[in-house]
Amino acid sequence: MNILCFGDSNTYGYRPDGTGRFDEKTRWTYLLQKKFGNRHRIIEEGLCGRTTIFSDAFREGRRGLDQIGITIETHNPIDLLILMLGTNDCKTHFNASSKTIAKGLIQVIEKAKKYSSQPFELLIISPIHLGNGVGDDDFDPEFDLASEQVSRQLAQEYRKVATHYHAGFLDASKIALPSEIDREHLDESGHAALADAIYKTITESGLLEKGMDSSFCHIA
């Protein structure tokens, strides 16, 4: 079965020290594939700076809503869609609330449904929190204190979205913390912990088993 992982820099595997990308064997997507073996195929679609619906004047092509359709079509058929977005939506210049970001996530889901060649199961992951002081000098000036607060409110809103769609849900902030190096991205241990948690969530919730049973309600 095909599992599409659609996210931002923490799906891409951006290194907290700013030196590029973690090697494949460090990233949570690879670790998840290793756990599943050849039973399922993990499709990695992470992009640094990706948002749900917001266009970033400083970085072209980061709006998830513009990309999810063609991504789905590229990899069809999709059996399970894993979405982990929202961190970049917390940037100061977007001035978005957690409720607004959750509405953006819904738009992404609806577009995915439109372009999918078949009904799919859905796992919504609320991202790790932004670390305290992420907007301080020498860190990331695109964030501020309000950004930190919004990131801490995402899980509550995303859980509501998951309930609405009868989807799986995982709060990554309960699993991992951002690296102390940049207060924003997962380190090696964070990737490993997230892979473990996602695997556990998928297997214990029976998401893939639902996908094989036509009697279950899929996202369509």
Named regions from a protein language model:
Residues Y14-P16, T52-S55, D140-E142, Q156-Y158:
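N-terminal start-of-chain detector that recognizes signal peptides
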